[in-house]
Swiss-Prot record:
GO terms for cellular component: cytoplasm; nucleoid. InterPro entries: MukE_C (IPR042037), MukE_N (IPR042038), Scp_MukE (IPR007385). It is found in: Cytoplasm, Nucleoid. Belongs to the MukE family. Involved in chromosome condensation, segregation and cell cycle progression. May participate in facilitating chromosome segregation by condensation DNA from both sides of a centrally located replisome during cell division. Probably acts via its interaction with MukB and MukF. Pfam families: MukE. It comes from Haemophilus ducreyi (strain 35000HP / ATCC 700724). GO terms for biological process: cell division; chromosome condensation; chromosome segregation; DNA replication. The keyword Zinc does not apply. HAMAP family: MukE. This is Chromosome partition protein MukE. Interacts, and probably forms a ternary complex, with MukF and MukB. The complex formation is stimulated by calcium or magnesium.
């Protein structure tokens, strides 16, 4: 039996699976997490065993992707055997704004640290406020309560993006400050085309193109099903 297993599994893949890093890393990838170079051990592990793990994940109908910026993630195919869920329009839009901030001069000026308020203010700056408020509440009158609900939605989107490695919290446990990972370019595939990156992001956000059905399909980030945890986090935040 042991000989059969050794014959069926390439030696280097067997070494990868036996590594103590693998179980937790595998769970993170399946839950939609992006593994950037800041995660030193996990990233080095994926670099060492990239070819073998690409073959391993293909069996589940998902692709292990290494983006041009160097981060890794799993991209499910339509026939995937791993449960998945797509991002909401608000999460996609907040991701686009984060990419815009990542490319901004302010990132260097602020030592790469942003806050939830920065994202909210930039979103109102770049997008049509009335459309945003209507998206949250179709009967919006532009009241302070409507704006509070929008801010709450932005906070929820940031929590989801933190969980998948797009941003990393800094400071105290409940801090609303964070740094943006290069994995934010999951939301900026279109900025690699050669045009000015900030201008491309700005156009997408201002013209309402950041969450079109086409972009939601082609750039969708998908997750393992963890809705129960989302609801718990949202209830704790209220």
């Amino acid at each position: 039996m042991t000989e059969y297993i050794q014959d069926a599994i390439p030696a280097k893949l067997a070494i990868a699976i036996a590594n103590p890093i693998f179980p937790q890393l595998d769970s993170q990838l399946r839950a939609g997490r992006h593994i950037s170079i800041e995660m030193l051990d996990e990233h080095a592990f994926l670099m060492d065993f990239q070819t073998e793990l690409e073959s391993f994940y293909r069996r589940y109908h998902v692709d292990l992707i290494r983006a041009p910026e160097g981060f890794f993630y799993l991209r499910p195919k339509a026939s995937t055997l791993i449960a998945r869920s797509a991002m909401s329009e608000m999460e996609m839009l907040v991701g686009k704004v984060l990419c815009y901030l990542y490319l901004s001069p302010e990132r260097l000026a602020q030592q790469g640290i942003f806050s939830q308020d920065d994202v909210y203010e930039e979103l109102l700056n770049l997008a049509d406020e009335n459309k945003l408020l209507k998206a949250v509440n179709p009967r919006s009158t532009g009241s302070d309560l409507d704006r509070a609900k929008l801010a709450e939605k932005v906070g929820g989107a940031l929590r989801r993006l933190a969980r998948i490695g797009i941003i990393t919290r800094v400071g105290e446990q409940n801090s609303k400050k964070f740094i943006i990972s290069e994995a934010v370019f999951r939301f900026g595939a279109d900025v690699r085309a050669g045009d000015d990156p900030r201008e491309v992001q700005l156009r997408l956000i201002r013209d309402g193109e950041a969450t079109t059905p086409t972009l939601l399909t082609t750039e969708a980030i998908e997750f393992a099903e963890d809705g129960a945890r989302d609801e718990l986090e949202e209830s704790e935040a209220e």
